[in-house]
């Protein structure tokens, strides 16, 4: 039994417990999570420290229910989210230190290479441009200006350029820095003597290649821009390569002297577009391989992640790290399904998937059963309509995590006991009816990825 199933059964039993007031359930218990430390140790995580105190008297009840569900003796601890996150970060830090030691021993290759960059329609032109210039620095497209929103892979490409040039042109000296780093150095040096300012310029100009990531951080800094302008001209005049990245195209940059904007456009300016779904999916699969996740991840689960995170490569990698952690905590699970994924990422606002609401759930379910949305909300008692209504209620609880009272109101003003009965009935049917389970899985996938 996976953690998602355990949590579902636990919440159903607790809401039916007459000793637990509905307001206590809705305020503190509804949002709890359960995680597995190892085969015999589980941890129940409450949203806040206050919530942890509020459910103190119900801890024995929660422990007993979990043991009943698992049908085995286990150790159960309780904590709250902030504290649990601290514990996770501490564990990750220890694991990272261990990984760093192993990496050094194995002389692990830098991950920011052209070979490790996932190419798709959204970034192909930028990739070709950076790779081409890296193979012939200072010859053409000088400067090379890459622009696009944060998290699209600009930093990866610029670091790949640095690594490639250093590996293939041992006689060339390469300097890589962020725009913020350059600005801080310039501001510091401007407090010093003219001689020291000139020395700083000369030190930067000793390089054969200059790469500045997020050059927009130099905007609205007049004195810094004067230093930058001098350095820029030195590189161009001496056929030394310049690489820049920014969140905007040169024409849209504010806070720069016009002569700098003109020079940004002297070479080649090229955009990295938002990731398309195909590229995001490829990045997820590559990251799963890179993180050596042995548990199989279904295509539906991967599509779910790409729908959430196609706007940011860093978030994609972070989401796969979350999968990796879950996989390590649940070694007995052989497959990561969309049900597990949707539960694992339930803390992420559903707005990231577009308009995900009760209306959408009703529409998808009613379409499947060939009935109207009004029929789901109405009083009709035919078998197909009742089944569709119960499934829609069940999915509303599963996906949106609405309260029983909310769901009752959203489905024709029914009371919360009707919702409990509907949810329990579907839960029981899913355990016995494989075809129904398949249907519900398909509906859930369609709702989440449509």
From Swiss-Prot:
One GO BP on record is: regulation of DNA replication
Keywords for this entry? ATP-binding, Cell membrane, Cytoplasm, DNA replication, DNA-binding, Lipid-binding, Membrane, Nucleotide-binding
Subcellular location field: Cytoplasm; Cell membrane
- Region spans: Domain II: 76-107
Q: Name one GO molecular function term.
A: lipid binding
Assembly description: Oligomerizes as a right-handed, spiral filament on DNA at oriC.
Reproduce the miscellaneous comment text.
Answer: Estimated to be present at 2000-3000 molecules per cell.
Q: What does this protein do?
A: Plays an essential role in the initiation and regulation of chromosomal replication. ATP-DnaA binds to the origin of replication (oriC) to initiate formation of the DNA replication initiation complex once per cell cycle. Binds the DnaA box (a 9 base pair repeat at the origin) and separates the double-stranded (ds)DNA. Forms a right-handed helical filament on oriC DNA; dsDNA binds to the exterior of the filament while single-stranded (ss)DNA is stabiized in the filament's interior.
Identify this protein by name.
Chromosomal replication initiator protein DnaA
Gene this protein is translated from: dnaA
């Amino acid at each position: 039994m996976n953690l998602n199933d355990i949590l579902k059964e636990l919440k159903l039993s607790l809401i039916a417990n007459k000793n637990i007031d509905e307001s206590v359930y809705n305020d503190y218990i509804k949002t709890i999570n359960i995680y597995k430390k190892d085969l015999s140790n589980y941890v129940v995580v409450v949203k806040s420290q206050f919530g942890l105190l509020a459910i103190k008297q119900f801890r024995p009840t929660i422990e007993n229910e979990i043991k009943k569900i698992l049908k085995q003796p286990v150790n159960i601890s309780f904590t709250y989210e902030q504290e649990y996150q601290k514990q996770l970060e501490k564990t990750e830090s220890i694991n990272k230190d261990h990984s760093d030691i192993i990496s050094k021993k194995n002389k692990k290759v830098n991950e920011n290479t052209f070979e490790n960059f996932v190419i798709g329609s959204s970034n192909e032109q930028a990739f070709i441009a950076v790779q081409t210039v890296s193979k012939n620095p200072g010859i053409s497209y000088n400067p090379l200006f890459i622009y696009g929103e944060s998290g699209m892979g600009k930093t990866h490409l610029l670091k790949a350029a640095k690594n490639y040039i250093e590996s293939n042109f041992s006689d060339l000296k390469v300097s890589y820095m962020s725009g913020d780093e350059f600005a801080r150095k310039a501001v510091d040096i401007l407090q010093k003597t003219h001689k020291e300012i000139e020395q700083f310029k000369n030190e930067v100009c000793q390089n054969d290649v200059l790469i500045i990531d997020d050059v927009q951080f130099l905007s609205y800094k007049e004195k810094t821009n004067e230093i930058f302008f001098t350095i820029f001209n030195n590189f161009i005049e001496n056929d030394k390569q310049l690489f820049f990245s920014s969140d905007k195209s040169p024409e849209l940059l504010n806070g720069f002297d016009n002569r700098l904007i003109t020079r940004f456009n002297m070479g080649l300016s090229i955009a990295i577009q938002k990731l398309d779904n195909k590229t995001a999916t490829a990045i997820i699969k590559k990251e799963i391989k890179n993180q050596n996740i042995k548990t199989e991840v279904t295509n539906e689960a991967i599509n779910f992640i790409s729908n959430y995170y196609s706007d940011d490569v860093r978030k994609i990698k972070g989401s796969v790290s979350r999968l990796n952690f879950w996989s390590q905590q649940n070694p007995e699970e052989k497959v990561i399904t969309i049900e597990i994924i949707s539960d694992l990422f339930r803390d992420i606002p559903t707005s990231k998937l577009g308009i995900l609401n009760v209306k959408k759930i009703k529409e998808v379910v009613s379409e499947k059963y060939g009935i109207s949305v009004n029929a789901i909300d109405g009083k009709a008692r035919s078998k197909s309509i009742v089944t569709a209504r119960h499934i829609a209620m069940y999915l509303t609880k599963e996906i949106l995590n609405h309260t029983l009272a909310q769901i009752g109101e959203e489905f024709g003003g029914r009371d919360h006991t009707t919702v409990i009965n509907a949810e329990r009935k579907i839960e029981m049917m899913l355990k016995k009816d494989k075809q129904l389970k398949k249907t519900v899985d398909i509906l859930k996938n369609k709702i989440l990825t449509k």
